[in-house]
């Protein structure tokens, strides 16, 4: 897969479909490599007429790592933030939004439909108000607004963020299978074998938990985005699982309520995951939202 110079770093990316089609930039979440946007799902977007771009965020996968920044003590920083103290992550979620726009620059793409999941939802929200001329439509999936007064993650889901990943391959795979199960939601059968295969591929491609810690530090440093979300003017779709234990559905509801004209799609039984049974509905909904640009 190719690399691009973007925002003074190197971004690993991948594309699907016809470059002359309307671009759709897919942005993944915390500690997640771009291959979590699996090829089958990317090709479903291609079949809807999109030119699909997926990429590794900074500090994950095969993009630039920020090793010189060290590994933060997340619990200490979390407690400091809870006490109202200012924290200073080595980079911000705004920097990550600028990375994504820098990738569009490198690919000579003036405007794109943007879709992000979880932390990726935060990133695309920021792109939409920070770089409004670059956005055709916005989809925010299983994300939130940064409002500290919203319901927080369930304790068992929050623990997943704070518990270190095992360094040994087989232990990592088994732990990942357990973690995915907790996040998956109760409404769909859990495909354990698929997630075991995915965990192995992710480990072999890039095992780098230090980057996830720094990304989480960046998330801890975010502010309430509601005052800026109200300025977004592009067609917006917010998708959320009704059974999300990590980012409760109230985060999706407030995102949709904050962006003028936004449509909200709540998928009952879906957790903090994208079960393959939901893909047709999700792809159709994103394509319909994108169609609003031309209508």
Regions inferred by a protein language model and the residue ranges of each:
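Short glycine-enriched nucleophile-adjacent loop
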Residues: 121-132, 138
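Alpha/beta-hydrolase
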Residues: 153-227, 254
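Flexible "cap/lid" loop of the alpha/beta hydrolase fold
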Residues: 129, 138-167
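Acidic catalytic loop of the alpha/beta-hydrolase fold
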Residues: 243-247
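Conserved acidic catalytic loop of the alpha/beta-hydrolase fold
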Residues: 82, 87-90, 94-112
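Short beta-strand/loop motif that positions the catalytic acidic residue
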Residues: 232, 238-240
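Catalytic active-site module of serine/aspartate enzymes centered on a nucleophile-bearing elbow/loop
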Residues: 262-295
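Conserved HGGG/HGGXW glycine-rich cap/lid loop of the alpha/beta-hydrolase fold
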Residues: 9-83
């Amino acid at each position: 897969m190719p690399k691009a110079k973007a925002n003074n770093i190197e971004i690993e990316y991948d594309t699907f479909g016809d470059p002359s089609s309307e671009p759709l930039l897919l942005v993944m979440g915390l500690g997640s490599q771009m291959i979590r946007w699996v090829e089958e799902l990317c090709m479903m977007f291609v079949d809807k007429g999109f030119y699909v771009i997926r990429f590794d965020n900074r500090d994950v996968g095969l993009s630039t790592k920020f090793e010189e920044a060290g590994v933060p003590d997340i619990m200490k920083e979390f407690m400091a933030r809870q006490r109202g103290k200012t924290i200073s992550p080595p980079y911000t979620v705004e920097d990550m939004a600028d990375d994504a726009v820098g990738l569009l620059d490198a690919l000579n793409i003036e405007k794109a439909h943007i879709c992000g999941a979880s932390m990726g939802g935060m990133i695309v929200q920021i792109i939409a108000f920070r770089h409004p001329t670059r956005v055709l439509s916005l989809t925010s999936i299983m994300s939130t607004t940064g409002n500290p007064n919203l319901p927080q993650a369930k304790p068992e889901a929050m623990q997943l963020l704070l518990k270190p990943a095992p360094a040994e391959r087989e232990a990592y795979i088994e732990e990942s299978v357990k973690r995915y199960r907790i996040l998956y939601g109760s409404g769909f059968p859990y495909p354990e074998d698929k997630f075991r295969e995915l965990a192995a591929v992710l480990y072999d491609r890039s095992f780098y938990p230090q980057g996830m810690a720094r990304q989480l530090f960046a998330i801890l440093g975010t502010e309430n985005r509601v005052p800026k979300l109200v300025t977004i003017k592009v067609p917006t779709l917010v998708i959320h699982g009704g059974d999300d234990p990590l980012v409760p559905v109230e985060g999706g509801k407030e995102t949709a309520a904050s962006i003028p004209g936004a449509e909200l799609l709540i998928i009952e039984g879906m957790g903090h995951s994208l079960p393959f049974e939901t893909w047709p509905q999700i792809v159709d909904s994103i394509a319909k939202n994108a169609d609003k640009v031309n209508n």
